[in-house]
Amino acid sequence: MNKAEKACEELKAMDELAAMSSPVHSMQPLSKLLLTVFYIFVTVSFNKYDITGLFFMLLFPVFAYQLAGIAVHTCFHKLRIVMPLVCAVGLFNPFFDKNIIMYIGSIGVSGGVISMLTLMMKGEFCLMASFLLVATTSIEEICRALRQLHFPKLLTSLLLLTFRYISVLLEEVAIMTEAYHLRAPGQKGIHISAWGSFLGQLLLRSMDRAEALYESMELRGFYGEFYYAEGKASNRFSWLGACVCAALIMLTRLYNIPALLGSMFM
């Protein structure tokens, strides 16, 4: 199985996750979308030195993953390429902010180290929340929720088509890669001299498939906007749960929970 085929399997696995049954899966897509956006907004609003307060924001995605029946390590495995890049964003902070702001024993910790860790945590937490939304909500439900928020139909249609038909492009890449390796057995990867013709053939084959798909869509009455199937029935408990979670998130942001807990036991 080549890399393109593995990527197709990854996409199918995401669809299987979204088709699971759990309290999180059964929530209204719009409530999940708004709650995720609210969580991300609150997470990034923490001060760059407030690492203790930010740490408690981890409780919400971890609890939601358990409630959804999805292992947390699944998120880290699926995003194994993106997460290191997010962590790398703040690597240079210790070189620019060298002021000592706290001590661990006799060891001084600079503000750059704290801000680096805070920035990494913000990125990881936001990725975890975003992945949970995609893993518990189908792309059709997400696009329908976006249309309910009056997002432009062009953007929602583009998002849906990109997600749905990226697998078609990957299938073409897999077929062409396999054909290339049959003609060049034992060669690792595709030689640089063949990159131009390979990409050109991929473009032509993709255009042919795209034209055939668009003609099929037109025959089925498509004229610029998808008509999404009826969403889940309105569930007041879904919105109640989302409001409770949003309130807890806001309380975590407004009050220093670690300091309050420390004052109770001191």
Regions found by a protein language model. Name each.
Residues 21, 25, 69-74, 103, ...:
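Membrane-helix interfacial "entry" motifs
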Residues 53, 71-79:
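Interfacial helix-loop-helix linkers and transmembrane-helix boundary segments
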Residues 73, 164, 215:
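Short alpha-helical basic/polar micro-motif
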